[in-house]
């Protein structure tokens, strides 16, 4: 079976083509193409602008993916698309494209939960069997484990997502959004040397990131580190009246990462203890962060476990993860009728019946 997957829940538009061989061989990635809407430094991406980007690029990416995969329309069994969660206008743009292809080509639709797509692609690439999943992105922060044909959420953010926290601080510092604000925060954090005290908010299995964002934004304003015209290469401590070094932009990025990642490690470890798992799978765009992987690895090794993560091809939003999860659902008989192919911005991970797993 072959599926085309369309992803566009945020600023990244992805088209992927996945093959599940009939002979039982492992699935094959035939094409995985992505195009990102990049907004100016200091700005986020508005839904209407992002949707316009997706509409302009989706047909080009589908054509390119088919060419790269060396498959024809006749070879495709189904069209998979992100049903949610995500931003309304971008989601709707991609859903309309999926409906158009379904009607033009006479192929069936499969609506896919974005979070489940991340999990299934992570499981496929890393070979992890039944891990505790840390799903961290710009719109979601969840600690997940599988049970009774559901991906159960054991903990999550109480307010904003961890990726949103990083992205919004990047706006405060006017850090470039190319290739991604979180990635540029990570690179700047590597130069940080001073750990600044920031709010640490873990409530049971849940985290809160709005308070730490407000605190670090306030420090950036207090020390005059926000706004345009800052040179990262000359980001050096400025002595205060007592001769102590005031934090630099790099110090604030470093401190923000260390604090929020410590919160994520704590809640993930608690979930591992609860379900008796020795594996952690990190998925979502923030999962590319090497420091997060390092900190999670230290915790897992102390417990005699292991950490699994993918590179940016599969961690960051992509179409191939939608094709993978869609094919798994399609193989169990799941279809999305045209009348039900609307989008759900708050489509919960645990709303999905995972029929393809025991």
UniProtKB/Swiss-Prot annotation:
Alphabetized InterPro entries for the sequence: ATPase_NBD, Gcp-like_dom, KAE1/TsaD, Kae1_archaea_euk
SUPFAM superfamilies tied to this protein: Actin-like ATPase domain
An individual GO BP term: positive regulation of transcription by RNA polymerase II
GO molecular function, one term: nucleotidase activity
Keyword Metal-binding among record annotations: yes
Positions of substrate binding: 135-139, 167, 182, 186, 289
Keywords: Activator, Acyltransferase, Cytoplasm, Metal-binding, Nucleus, Transcription, Transcription regulation, Transferase, tRNA processing
Stored Pfam families: TsaD (PF00814)
Enzyme Commission code(s) on record: 2.3.1.234
Reaction catalyzed: L-threonylcarbamoyladenylate + adenosine(37) in tRNA = N(6)-L-threonylcarbamoyladenosine(37) in tRNA + AMP + H(+)
Cofactor(s) recorded in Swiss-Prot or TrEMBL: a divalent metal cation
EC supergroup of this enzyme: transferase
Binding site for a divalent metal cation: 114, 118, 135, 317
Protein's UniProt keywords contain Metal-binding: yes
Domain of life: Eukaryota
Compartments, record wording: Cytoplasm; Nucleus
Similarity field: Belongs to the KAE1 / TsaD family.
Functional note: Component of the EKC/KEOPS complex that is required for the formation of a threonylcarbamoyl group on adenosine at position 37 (t(6)A37) in tRNAs that read codons beginning with adenine. The complex is probably involved in the transfer of the threonylcarbamoyl moiety of threonylcarbamoyl-AMP (TC-AMP) to the N6 group of A37. Kae1 likely plays a direct catalytic role in this reaction, but requires other protein(s) of the complex to fulfill this activity. The EKC/KEOPS complex also promotes both telomere uncapping and telomere elongation.
Assembly with partners or alone: Component of the EKC/KEOPS complex composed of at least bud32, cgi121, gon7, kae1 and pcc1; the whole complex dimerizes.
HAMAP family: Kae1
Protein's recorded name: tRNA N6-adenosine threonylcarbamoyltransferase
Organism per entry: Aspergillus oryzae (strain ATCC 42149 / RIB 40)
Gene behind the chain: kae1
